[in-house]
Amino acid sequence: FLCNLLKFSVECNMIEYVYIYSLAGFSAKEKEIARMNSRMNLNIVCIPGDGIGPEIVAEAKKVLDKVAVKFGHSISYKDILMGGASIDACGEPLTDEAIAAAKAADAVLMGSIGGNTSTSPWYQLPPHLRPEAGLLKLRKELNLFANLRPAYLYKELREACPLREDIIGGGFDMMIMRELTGGLYFGERSTRTMNGVVTAVDTLTYTENEIRRIAIKGFDIAMKRRKKVTSVDKANVLDSSRLWRKVVEEVALDYPEVTLEHMLVDNCAMQLVKDPKQFDVILTENMFGDILSDEASMVTGSIGMLSSASLNDTKFGLYEPSGGSAPDIAGKGIAN
């Protein structure tokens, strides 16, 4: 996971660095000057979270410390509570103090949030007090509207991939760009009883500005990859998807080198297992991206190898493994 996160971060231009020892043609003095100029002082807020989260974050810190020594960086850490750990200690999934600490940081490194939804007492609480409510609130407070989820098949994991060898072929490498702060998860919701019948309502809302900014991110990433964007929607049914498709087509005009195709979400779910090699950047809304990114992660052979970044319109980001909290193996020291 950590190696993939570093590779992924460089690809997305979220870490500015100079790889000193590969600067062919530069003198030793010039390399040392480049090394000095690339040194960073970083303040990273860590959210160990729940389940295996604390174990994962502890190992990640060890790797970051080695990187800091190797390249002369200075990294300071501040741990904050979120999710179930915060509920147990503070009575709420995310405190104002934790939000302030995250806003003051250069980046956030998160482990995992939540527990067993069937047995944990956290899930007997009202929805706004459950572990995941803290993560949703943090995304909104930090304006983390762009979620990047790579799905890459390592040759060492080919045998773990559930797809046939003729489908895998030469492997696949895709990036799922998911809008993260709009749509169904952030719309108005209610549950009420009318004439003796319980009715639940969730609202799916998108503005053209919300769609435009995630589309720009998606096309920017595509320019650094194989220059293809697959925009996924449900435009044959949903008004929000018809607006999505219209705005994405407008953004595409500014990227003539990028090939744009539209795909309905149900077809995309099928194509991910039928021919994953066809995808480069998948651009989609919040709920569709939530589902498709988990599906894509499983055809790689192990979700434990995959990373996730949630970004705003600056270089700030929240970085985490794609896997869950795995409470059944927490504390055993066997988490990947």
Predicted regions and their residues:
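Glycine-rich phosphate/nucleotide-binding loop
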Residues: 84, 272-335
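Short hydrophobic alpha-helical segments enriched in small aliphatic residues
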Residues: 18-20, 28
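Glycine-rich phosphate/diphosphate-binding loop of Rossmann-like nucleotide-binding domains
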Residues: 45-61, 67, 196-266
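N-terminal glycine-rich phosphate/adenylate-binding segment common to multiple enzyme folds
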Residues: 87-201, 287-289
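Buried hydrophobic positions in well-ordered alpha/beta secondary-structure cores of metabolic enzymes
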Residues: 50-53, 106, 177, 218, ...
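N-terminal beta-loop-helix "entrance" segment that forms/cooperates
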Residues: 72-95, 272
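Extreme N-terminal starter segment of soluble prokaryotic enzymes
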Residues: 39-44
